[in-house]
Amino acid sequence: MQPERLIVFSRYPEPGKTKTRLASALGVEGAARLQREMAEHALSRARALAAERPVGLEVHYEGGSAGRMAEWLGPGLAYHRQVGGDLGARMENAFAEALRTGEEKVVLVGTDCPGITTTILRSAFNLLASFDLVLGPARDGGYYLIGLRNRVPHLFRSIPWGTAEVATRTLELATGLGLRAVTVDLLVDVDHPEDLPVWEREAGQTGELGPPRMSVVIPTLNEEEHLEATLESVTREPDIEVIVVDGGSSDRTAELALARGARLLTTTAQRARQMNAGAAAASAPVLLFLHGDTRLPPGFSGRALELLAGRGTAAGAFRLAVAGPGWGLRAIEGLANARSRLLHLPYGDQALFVTAELFRRAGGFPDL
């Protein structure tokens, strides 16, 4: 028995019974061939992960038989027919069986998102050391990956499968159950003819993308009004990992974060704990902590990285500018900027940045 298990959900590529929504563009034979290629693509990522860590690999299939699946995908895998009615029941049963036999971390992935990488799979297993639920959201509102370390049957029930609410509803249920949840990369799934360029682009990539230069951590609680503008200011720069740590918002904060491609964590509504949780999940060498109602200036990442590379610079922040007219706001700006310049005591609104190594050595933010 291995402590980690990776389950790949797939379907035997039988013409006329798979990828039917793509048949109008590819024909039934072409749609089946695409299903075959996408499953092989996803499985190659899974096998690459198994080559570097002791992960048990399983394929849970629909259509065909275990023998036909083995002829297609080869030996060295455990093949199981999917059991249950709807997708939720089939996933619930797969997790129940895996966790019943003693696995400590179980990740289940589909094969519809060609952007899946070994890095994402590795990250999912690593995050399960600190979180109860890991979710890989898809652009259409569903998810391509889910990871658990305990049985949580309610996560697969009362879900409107096949709608744009699947991922957000799952995260809402997780919050209600008191689970610590985190998302990995937002990916695009290939279900319709207009999605085919995504497959063509991803299938042509032979290497993995490099790591992000900076992780921006945004603690939130009901920030629907401001969050979209905040995320727009962050995501216009390349190689930035965006992590929204939500404290249980009752508005559309989580939905907006996912729509913008941010990773989403859920935890208790306490700012220091939220920022520490985001820092723990971050993968970049530099951390930037940003309030949900604050916008960053153009070129923020380059300037921050340049300053941190300088001798004697441990951390930094930006000048404060408050939106709106009036001498009172200008006075607040002036006092805040003077305080940070002269006393080296910036406010959180000024977007604090620091190397991840130094932040972790310092023990993070105090739990006040």
Each language-model region and where it sits:
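Short aromatic/hydrophobic "clamp" motif used to bind/position activated sugar donors
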Residues: 106, 287
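Short, well-formed alpha-helical segments that are part of the catalytic scaffolds
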Residues: 14-47, 222-236
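Acidic donor-binding/catalytic loop of UDP-sugar-dependent glycosyltransferases
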Residues: 111-126, 252, 272, 292-306
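Cell-envelope/extracellular polymer assembly enzymes that use nucleotide-activated donors
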Residues: 5, 213-215, 241
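A recurrent flexible, glycine/aromatic-enriched loop bordering the glycosyltransferase active site
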Residues: 133-140, 315-325, 336-361
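A conserved acidic beta->alpha catalytic loop
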Residues: 63-66, 233, 246-254, 294
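Conserved donor NDP-sugar-binding/catalytic core segment of glycosyltransferases
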Residues: 127-133, 298-328
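Acidic helix N-cap motif at the loop->helix transition within catalytic regions
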Residues: 67-70, 225-229, 251-260
